Amino acid sequence: FIKDDELMANPPHSPFDERVDAIMRIINAHADRTGKKVMYAFNVSDELDAMQRHYEKIVSAGGTCAMISLNSVGLAGAKKICDLGALAIHGHRNGWGMLNRHPLLGIEFSAYQKLWRLAGVDQIHVNGIANKFWESDDSVVRSMEACAKPLLGGMSVLPVVSSGQWGGQAPETFRRTKTVDLLYMAGGGIMAHPNGAAAGVRSLQKWWEAAVEGLTMESAAAKYPELNISLDKFGKKSG
């Protein structure tokens, strides 16, 4: 899974249609070669008519996912895109801090996520353990648990774990949630790996293997010495 940045919609320096063509050319070629198609979430956030055009561009190019900035497009905009039905919908909650950071303002995530699930989103951001923002680990865990609860007898929504993630948080994330039914998103944790992006991806996979084995960050690094590369690079921020 790969996604656009939530601030990257249709700017002059990266026009939406050109970006879709460039990225899907690589993804489709990779799928033809390997039989595995990477899901890429293109950020369609815009006015309603433009969002629908962006959505149709993804479909015609062979894409599988559209991203919307929930707090920017609103419930009506989100439902309009979700109702089109051809793509998975990745819901980004950028701007969430203004709705929840102060205890006397806004809405609790357990209620917030229900609104977007009713609109039809398939994936929704929940922050992450030992994240780079203000939110506590306890709050993140509550958010993940809320996503796992069936709504109106239906399906759950996939929590998207992100924000300063590099792999070392995986053991604590799994210890506290006991699930691998999530998207674990890392930007710098992959791209800034000392041995390159491919090594960054392999490192995340190995950290999660260790997490499911029940290892702590320290015991994982002891059992799998290659994990010390990311540990030395990104520090011991694990939860």
Question: What are these regions, as identified by a protein language model?
Answer:
Residues 2-5, 37-43, 68, 125-126:
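Short beta-strand segments at enzyme active-site cores
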Residues 18-19, 23-38, 42, 46-59, ...:
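N-terminal active-site wall of soluble small-molecule enzyme domains
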Residues 53-55, 61-186, 199:
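Catalytic alpha/beta core domains of metabolic enzymes, predominantly
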Residues 103, 229, 234-239:
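Ser/Thr/Pro-rich, acidic low-complexity intrinsically disordered regulatory segments
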